[in-house]
């Protein structure tokens, strides 16, 4: 049986490496799968798409790139884009070099004698910026100028963009994005672990070669446990959050037996594995601080959307190929309505805050408590309120959480102890992160003094540990316990309403990022070299008629469209 595990791991590693060919894991038919429709097929989409500058030109990756291509055709707009890029670079520039970077920005884009003066900038605002720059180059120095530049771009230039071939090309990409997603969109690989309602396995998009984790929720298991609301809640929260520190939902689809969430694949294992199974338990302080800072950013992104996580623990923090973390498993996360509090005694014993244990009302305070527990565990090599592999009754753990201060060893520096103790304050009103400043309070703690959070948020800081690319950081295939068959439950037509709410296909921002990262956008986004309109973007032209199929083709052909095309036999991976 060891052979079975070796084969499964070998096939997965080969897929992660791009299959060893020039296509980097893409199907032989990838261009056919991502073939643009004729623009006339996008008319309904054109009429229904909301004309929002922020969404179309800033948030959506392909929309952002196409708007920039449009701006590159007009010098005054090209200067605006260059200024915005310069500001973004200024904000992540190290402190000791930021003033010089700011001076260069001012000279190029804000001075009348500069080569790239941007339009419609109040001179008084420029004067104020210049003075503030010399006094001290704060990161938000150009914030108002950035807002005014976007305001300028969002009026006449945006209107012109909507009438351009670049926006028409965006409609074609949106048409592809909205095509049905089925199990044939993916290749399936080995099981990685178990979720609450089914297995988690590795998978690969046939059209792009992008690897993901597929979390399968068995329909009968959901129905037996009455888990419909919980499953839909997790899906909708994942769909809403766009953060480099939280796993992304890229697709949601259904098969005959399961609902499937296609999520960011994290190849580096979870923090529980790294804390306890990679030598001495715990991390050096610098490594623990780095992970705590990234988790803080993830919590900040969740809380910005008014989502409280409620299940922060080592096994829910995953490492990617480069050693950065993402928060995973949002099954217990919930939206907190503006101006309201919630109640719910949920979470994991030893990580639940005192107010949760007491069943009191709260907003986001349990997450900051759990961050304190996790930081403590990363440094100490054990949880603050229970020792590993030592059985303590739940009631005793909860008594310790509510009443007994945690103990600190010599492994904690004074600053690390200070941050942990402020996060583990029993009174949520006095806890760091809950005094009115949220994540900002935590980020300003002296333990993070050497960290540039702007650079961290942009993924520009080198992690202290990089996972081995040839390692599989999960249990052997046969060591992952299989689910038993669900008996006594039958699926009914009325269940279909829930399935339709769940299986909504591609999620726009992750899907567009996938197209860009896998270079599909770069290879397919081609316009006429002489400035002419390509046939597929000509509103006056007619879409080409599909080639006629012979009788045998009509009888035996399978439906081929947008990622649902099946590969030839030789391309299919070994399935175990």
Curated annotation (Swiss-Prot):
Residues 53-171 form the RGS domain. Keywords: ATP-binding, Kinase, Lipoprotein, Membrane, Nucleotide-binding, Palmitate, Phosphoprotein, Serine/threonine-protein kinase, Transferase, Wnt signaling pathway. The modification Phosphoserine is found at residues 484, 566, 568. It catalyses: [G-protein-coupled receptor] + ATP = [G-protein-coupled receptor]-phosphate + ADP + H(+). Residues 449-514 form the AGC-kinase C-terminal domain. It is found in: Membrane. One of its GO terms (cellular component) is membrane. One of its GO terms (molecular function) is ATP binding. SMART domains: RGS, S_TK_X, S_TKc. CDD domains: STKc_GRK6. ATP binds at residues 192-200, 215, 264-270, 315-318. It is uncertain whether palmitoylation is on Cys-561 and/or Cys-562 and/or Cys-565. Widely expressed. Its EC number is 2.7.11.16. Residues 186-448 form the Protein kinase domain. It comes from the Eukaryota. Changing residue 7 to A: 12-13 fold defects in kinase activity; 180-fold defects in kinase activity. PANTHER family: G PROTEIN-COUPLED RECEPTOR KINASE 6, G PROTEIN-COUPLED RECEPTOR KINASE/RIBOSOMAL PROTEIN S6 KINASE. Belongs to the protein kinase superfamily. AGC Ser/Thr protein kinase family. GPRK subfamily. Specifically phosphorylates the activated forms of G protein-coupled receptors. Such receptor phosphorylation initiates beta-arrestin-mediated receptor desensitization, internalization, and signaling events leading to their desensitization. Seems to be involved in the desensitization of D2-like dopamine receptors in striatum and chemokine receptor CXCR4 which is critical for CXCL12-induced cell chemotaxis. Phosphorylates rhodopsin (RHO) (in vitro) and a non G-protein-coupled receptor: LRP6 during Wnt signaling (in vitro). Interacts with GIT1. This is G protein-coupled receptor kinase 6. It comes from Homo sapiens (Human).
